[in-house]
UniProtKB/Swiss-Prot annotation:
The protein's role, per its UniProt record: Responsible for tylosin resistance, and is proposed to be a subunit of a multicomponent export system for the energy-dependent efflux of tylosin.
Record's bilayer topology term: Peripheral membrane protein
One Pfam family named in its UniProt record: ABC_tran
SUPFAM superfamilies per record: P-loop containing nucleoside triphosphate hydrolases
Gene name per UniProt: tlrC
Binding site for ATP 2: 387-394
Coiled coil: none
Keyword Coiled coil: no
Keyword terms: Antibiotic resistance, ATP-binding, Cell membrane, Membrane, Nucleotide-binding, Repeat, Transport
The protein's name: Tylosin resistance ATP-binding protein TlrC
Amino acid sequence: MRTSPSSQLSLHGVTKRYDDRVVLSQVSLAISPGEKAGIIGDNGAGKSTLLRLLAGEERPDAGEVTVIAPGGVGYLPQTLGLPPRATVQDAIDLAMTELRVLEAELRRTEAALAEAATDEALQDALTAYARLTEQYEVRDGYGADARVDAALHGLGLPGLPRDRRLGTLSGGERSRLALAATLASQPELLLLDEPTNDLDDRAVHWLEEHLSGHRGTVVTVTHDRVFLDRLTATVLEVDGRGVSRHGDGYAGYLAAKAAERRRRQQQYDEWRAELDRNRRLAEANVARLDGIPRKMGKAAFGHGAFRARGRDHGAMSRVRNAKERVERLTANPVAPPADRLSLTARIATADGPGEAPAAELDGVVVGSRLRVPKLRLGAAERLLITGPNGAGKSTLLSVLAGELSPDAGAVSVPGRVGHLRQEETPWPAKLTVLEAFAHNRPGDRDEQADRRLSLGLFEPEALRLRVGELSYGQRRRIELARLVSEPVGLLLLDEPTNHLSPALVEELEEALTGYGGALVLVTHDRRMRSRFTGSHLELREGVVSGAR
């Protein structure tokens, strides 16, 4: 693949709304050829919307989007838009639409060459064939299928049959299939929405190496902080309907945000101090005026009386000036740095049976997916479960949650369990955020709204939004809110960082440090794993291969 010096992306005055909700307003930005940019922001801020605009999947309501990429565009959405009856080959063809179109045009041109009745028709067909062949070779179309196999192997899906139905694949397998096919199409411009979701360590490492060697432009939405550090030089933050650009990668973004917050705090502190000083000045001089008699007898009109009246006029002037400054400062307030939506709840621990284990497994077998001879989890123990995709991690959590009965063995979990699943709950699209949160929960509507708002995960107006209007990250917040709003003795977290913003992941980590019950964590987030303190269990092909 060759990159074009004219390849670029730009937005000029772009506004995008859904019904009456404005997601992006007057956004302008440019991305240079060969640039590797990460898009971050709060859940629902408009990250995926921005990527869809760049991919041409949606059109702006105002403004202009320009994408010049003669070498093609590869777009990876968060979900594969094909029905369960579709095949693996259908998914590959969808990701390689541009190449498949070129192949079809080549076949039509070959037919035109064979059927040309005149020299002029033959020359036209030869010219078209040469042009199409050059385009196809630039994309290395002849090696595309081999690249699919290589990418599937790198992402942990070797030998996937092309005729296999998508409905027989897990959500993670479908995501990796779509990613492999998108990369194999070898476009000049890659637009990737959460590409590291559902990838184990080996697959993420392969992806980082592949994208680092990509000679074109990469724009990716991701919550993976290590991935941002290693791949991107530019960070685009979507916030408050706008997009801001930061250099020096994710570390540079964090430093810039911290400096900006300090600057805003200093400006607010200075404004507040000046306002308070002038209010005190006005009040002090009013009190001084009150101490000077308004009327004096004739005997008082001496030298001292003129000094008193002079002080009187001076105090009045100071009061007037101070009041004017207070009015100006009040009319032009300086806002303090905004507090981001964050997880403010403390995850409560349910009362359990004293020092009894939170969970015990003995001789557990689940088909060919899981074999656990013995596992004991203390009342306040923390356990990190790792292993490649398909190792049985989610199966083990489902057994601990009581959602999956083993074929053999005994399971004892005496306390209350909270389970954050990897797969999202299929809430009806017409439910509001508040209705989804309150589903099967005691308490009236106002009480549920207060509980929801106290968690800090949604603004008040967001409680009225329909589930169908939410981003993946916002729907994940519903699950997180339901989890942390009830006390539990055993907390099971299956890929809790999926679809959450980096800032919220930090808040979740902080909330977990204050949780006093037993915790079992499955995560591909390398930074979360590096900060984890507790026991470690490794699974491979459903069998415990290591523990410490």
